């Protein structure tokens, strides 16, 4: 939907989020008479037309007091970001440039822009929950680094000295993992034998990865690493995951180096919201914000 859609009452809020599906939903919490809210309104409206792949909603904290309380709104304007009805981020204040940067950040490599029909109902692409600053990759080449495999484009991650890679992926809140996508080329350089570890207390090296018992070991086929491939995980073992360490031991064709075109995880957040990011301070009617 192009344009900002006002949410008229509390019962309307969840249906609007449901309608957004896996697309990014940007919700502006505003209040009548709030100067900063009025100042950023034209820019917010402009962004809704500039980024039609996202859904833009506006909630008045007095008209929808229950929604404001549930989402712990303590000041206006506050912008909350949702995907699959799950809150994934927030932005506070009337800085239009900062808000647009946040929107672009979430739309970059947007898993919601192309609906993944192979993702089971009730699960979602967890790319928005990956904390890129907390990720690490050992034995990546200088020319083809780790960031490349987090994007759906022609770039790729390639190993450097040999065929092995050791990747640590951090999440910004605990998640449950159902499966993963692990895409590679069909020239023999795609990954084959892979060990998956979760929630390691510290980084491991290649020697430790070789000798340690994984949470799950994978033997990927050429079909698994195609674009439409899904690699199932043992769901009961991946119920409260803060980080994943992926040890790629070998590739499909015993090639000198390994390439990964793209990977992501499918699952759900443990909680619908990351409450550590928010203080429960709800303004009363008539208070200044």
Swiss-Prot record:
Alphabetical keyword list: Cytoplasm, Disulfide bond, Electron transport, Nucleus, Phosphoprotein, Proteasome, Redox-active center, Transport
GO cellular component: cytoplasm; cytosol; nucleus; proteasome complex
Signal sequence, start to end: none
Modified residues (Phosphoserine): 113
Domain Thioredoxin: 2-109
Cited Gene3D superfamilies: Glutaredoxin (3.40.30.10), PITH domain (2.60.120.470)
CDD domains for the chain: TRX_family
Tissues in which the protein is found: Ubiquitous.
Intrachain disulfide bonds: 34-37
InterPro entries, sorted: Galactose-bd-like_sf, PITH_dom, PITH_dom_sf, Thioredoxin-like_sf, Thioredoxin_CS, Thioredoxin_domain
Taxonomy, superkingdom: Eukaryota
Domain PITH residue range list: 115-285
GO molecular function: disulfide oxidoreductase activity; protein-disulfide reductase activity
Record's subcellular location: Cytoplasm; Nucleus
Subunit structure and binding partners: Component of the 19S regulatory cap of the 26S proteasome. Interacts with PSMD14/RPN11. Interacts with, and reduces EEF1A1.
Function: Active thioredoxin with a redox potential of about -250 mV.
Protein's name in the database: Thioredoxin-like protein 1
